[in-house]
From Swiss-Prot:
Keywords: Cell membrane, Membrane, Transmembrane, Transmembrane helix. Belongs to the Casparian strip membrane proteins (CASP) family. The chain crosses the membrane at residues 1-21, 49-69, 81-101, 132-152. It is found in: Cell membrane. Homodimer and heterodimers. It comes from the Eukaryota. GO terms for cellular component: plasma membrane. This is CASP-like protein 2U1. It is a multi-pass membrane protein. It comes from Osmunda lancea. InterPro entries: CASP/CASPL (IPR006459), CASP_dom (IPR006702). Residues 70-80, 153-177 are extracellular. Its main location: membrane.
Amino acid sequence: MVLRIVASLLSIAALVLMAKDKQVVYLNLAGEELTLEAKHSYVEAFVYLVYSNGLVAIYCFLLVFALVFRLIDKAGCGKSAAWIIFLLDQGLAYVLLAAAAASTEVAYVAKRGNNKVGWSEVCSTFGHFCNLVGVSIVITFISVLAMATLSVMSARRLFKTYGPERKQISSNDAPAI
């Protein structure tokens, strides 16, 4: 349960950093004042990152809520609930990984540019924006690790529901040696 809270908090932190990240730059080109603005909503990959982090944060929060108030019995989780949790953990881990990877590519192009297609880098102009984007992406990758760990844990819990029945062996049932 603690790891779900950590994943939720990490996703919220990454979401807030990216959603609030904005920078306005004023340039003087040939005597003309030019205003340039950078914010996450201008880049689809960053919008995807914000929504993915929000989805993970809400899911983890709702599952923690359900576990705390025993809406889902943690110890005696039935097969259907174990399957649902496993599939959602897996799916959201992959969604978050895809969002982080897409955002990393966009951030890389913003930082380095791409000479083959004539795209220049923009982080020298929007340094503060690029730095916060980088921090948000790093936090998202940490959240991906938390979700991947949760996926392994939920898979283990699921596979235990298909394990052999364990019965207690009394001293009378022990085989003679």
